Amino acid sequence: MQAVQFFDCAHNYSPGERPSKQQRAFYLAFPAVESLMQCGSTNFWIPANISNRMRKNTKRFEAHRTHPSTPGGAEGEKSFRTQTKHARQSHEPGLHWGHVGSWYDDLIGQDGSDHHQKLIIPGVLRMLDIKPGEHLLDVACGQGVLGRAAARRGVQTTGVDLAGSLIQAALERRENTSLEHYYQADVRDLAACGAIAPGIFDAAACVLAIANITPLSPVWQGIYTALKPGGKLVVVLPHPCFRIPKQSSWQWDQQNAMQHRLVDAYLTSEKIPIAMHPGRDTGPTTTTFHRPLQAYINTLGSAGLWIDHTEEWISGKMPPQGIRFAALDKSRREIPLFLALRAIKAG
């Protein structure tokens, strides 16, 4: 996908608890939970507080870092400009998910994960308030899970993604060929896609993908052009304040019987390679771009997309029953998993 980033860390596992086989598959691809460590080809599930100390004392990944220039300043993404003009993703594996498309399609399936079905897709469609017969642009659509859900409501959907394998999956999974349309194209150059004309879309969405795309501005500018005046955009991403790959983790405070969310770095923008199969000497990687919240707000505004509504979504997954349930559930309810931004096309 161009590229969906999925963090299943909100289950708030108690230290040392072993997730299910399916959940481990998510963690191997999206290491947002620091309870998985590797030694050679062996995976060890260890208490989060121990893994946090190990993480602080061990160089676990290579990251290109830059501090934002000015508070609330330009894009917070200028450190990533080495990828342009725009460093076409088709020539740089890791900046789209075509090379892991088959695996991802099998993982997500026809209707998406539990988070997609119960939280994300209902939330996106509610925030867009899109009606039957209206036209939705699904930016970085992957294998079309949002498009299928929208089409079931009678919405015309056009999905765009650079990963050819995922576009093929979206076409094969279509439920309504008259309402669902999918195209392989770079979302940073939407004008180059012949199916996207200026001012024809009532709404647009970018779901669990924007943190894997750089730079931001061409994406927003293309969406602005494609939307009708007053058209809405909803962007959903792992919450950039609390869900930072390899820079955030849960820690259990034994003395006070509390679970804390630790954040080691936030304002620094980072390009973070993610190994899809940790523990192996070789294997595919994807790339995540952490940015502070100001980067999203400022670039959207600069493109003429004005944020009018924001929601912070918590995980719907309950922690395990036990003596720590109340504390773990409080952290689940207080620390959001996803950030949803709605912006309106000005003019």
Feature locations, PLM:
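Conserved class I S-adenosyl-L-methionine
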Residues: R55-G72, G76-K131, V145, A149, L233-P273, ...
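Class I SAM-dependent methyltransferase SAM/SAH-binding core
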Residues: H135-V139, Q143-A192
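A short acidic, Gly/Pro-enriched loop at the edge of an enzyme's catalytic core
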Residues: C193-A204
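A short SAM/SAH-binding and catalytic strip from SAM-dependent methyltransferases
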Residues: D202-S217
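A short glycine-rich, Lys/Arg-flanked "PGG" loop and its adjoining helix->strand segment in the class I
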Residues: S217-K232
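Acceptor-substrate binding/catalytic loop of class I
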Residues: L237, C241-W250, R280-Q294
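Short alpha-helix
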Residues: T287-T310
